[in-house]
Amino acid sequence: MRVKGGTVSRARRKKFVKLAKGYRGQRRINYKVAKQQVYKSYLYAYRDRKNTKRNFRKLWIARINAAARMNGLSYSKLMHGLTLAGVELNRKMLAEIAVSDFDTFTKLADQAKAALSSDNVLVQARTAATTDTTVSVER
């Protein structure tokens, strides 16, 4: 006699139909369509877990940029100035400070400006020392 494995097959099919709860139409009733949709849902979930990280980073950068421009700096100059000043705050924390405590963010922006101005003086001195305007080529 052939063994068909009825209870195992039924349990497997019920599992997919149960996972498809909340879908519209045949996607929640029909096993074959439900299985395809559940697999597709897993792909969407995987993709969007990655996209969530990107979207939050974009949001944080937009918030930091808006607050930086209110203090007379661009985003890139603010971040470079904070790096020069030795401030090690990530974008998430900077965005939270910009939204909730603008006075503290202004102090951080002032630190960045000070670090940028001192670095700018060093860069100008370095370029002045390396620039030689009396170059002559003899032929």
UniProtKB/Swiss-Prot annotation:
MF (Gene Ontology): rRNA binding; structural constituent of ribosome
Alphabetical list of Gene3D superfamilies matching this protein: 6.10.160.10, Ribosomal protein L20
An annotated GO cellular component: ribosome
GO BP of this protein: ribosomal large subunit assembly; translation
Keyword list, A-Z: Ribonucleoprotein, Ribosomal protein, RNA-binding, rRNA-binding
Pfam families for the chain: Ribosomal_L20
InterPro entries for this protein: Ribosomal_bL20 (IPR005813), RIBOSOMAL_L20_CS (IPR049946), Ribosomal_protein_bL20_C (IPR035566)
Function: Binds directly to 23S ribosomal RNA and is necessary for the in vitro assembly process of the 50S ribosomal subunit. It is not involved in the protein synthesizing functions of that subunit.
Protein family: Belongs to the bacterial ribosomal protein bL20 family.
Protein name: Large ribosomal subunit protein bL20
Gene: rplT
